[in-house]
Amino acid sequence: VKTSVVICVYTEERWEDIRQAVESVGNQTRQPHELILVVDHNPDLLLKLKRAYPQAVVVENTHEKGLSGGKNTGVDVATGDIVAYLDDDAVADPWWLEALEEGFQEPGVVGVGGRTEPLWASKRRPRWFPYEFDWTVGCTYRGMPEVRAPIRNVMGGNAAFLREVVSEVGGFHSGIGRSVQGRKSRPLGCEETEFCIRLSQRKPGSVMLFEPRAVIGHKVSRQRERFAYFRSRCYAEGLSKALVTREVGTQDGLSSERAHAMKTLPLGALRGLGEALRGDVGGLGRAFAIVVGLAWTTWGYVVGSARLKAVRS
């Protein structure tokens, strides 16, 4: 099997992050068929990367500006059987690619996602930050499987798909978040969720697999360690989910979220209160953050749904 690894990049400010991401791909126990660096409409960075990495395939994003356009460009250029995506601010463990590839040996598997661990800029997790909400910083969260298991959708920065299947279903949708943005630009990260559900709907029997042995570390900036970002990201996720349900329907679009909200989050809040009673003051903060996170996400969903109805009418 041949795997093309795609890293989408956009700014020189992340040069050191990009360097570490590329280095981690070079240190894999199973080397990729090719490494593709897709540059998002930044000619200076494109030239710099071509000079620094002559062994890589360095190309310009030929689709609409943004991460989805970059991912689609990667699929267009790739010649491998599998396309694996790694965030430009992530570092893959040496056995990451090997574990992803092994996941495709399971029957019906068209996509495999790995485990993403946070690399905190402050070197430690904020005491108030609940594990149930690690998705707000692009990481695997409490409530996801702990062993290899089918899941509804993978997380975009640590995932692999059969190349032909991505093309068959039309790739990743660009800019689907614009109609609910409002006056403020927000990080609407719903593209991979919508893509995975759309793929499963169009190709019944297709399996998305979670493979916890495919591990990467994802860097979390100090700004993203703040409670203000946490709230904003939760609200943006609610807006995103309104879009996802418009595209793929409420039943599929909210199935995982309902289970998380009805079971995992209440247990997490109770756990935090219990830890606070046992002397861990941070437990109170985690319980509070779970309540706020759920409320802000729900409010975002309500606002997003209302904006979509207004656009339709």
Model-predicted regions and their roles:
Residues V1-S24:
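N-proximal low-complexity "stem/linker" segments adjacent to membrane-targeting elements
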Residues V22-P32:
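Short, acidic, metal-binding catalytic loop of nucleotide-sugar glycosyltransferases
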Residues N61-A78:
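Glycine-rich, basic loop-to-helix element that forms the pyrophosphate-binding segment
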Residues V83:
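Short aromatic/hydrophobic "clamp" motif used to bind/position activated sugar donors
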Residues W95-W128:
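Conserved donor NDP-sugar-binding/catalytic core segment of glycosyltransferases
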Residues P130-I151:
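Short, flexible, basic/aromatic active-site loop/helix in glycosyltransferases
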Residues N158-F161, V165-G170, I176-A214:
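A short, conserved alpha-helix in the catalytic core of glycosyltransferases
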Residues S232-A236, T250-S313:
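Non-catalytic, C-terminal membrane-associated alpha-helical segments of glycosyltransferases
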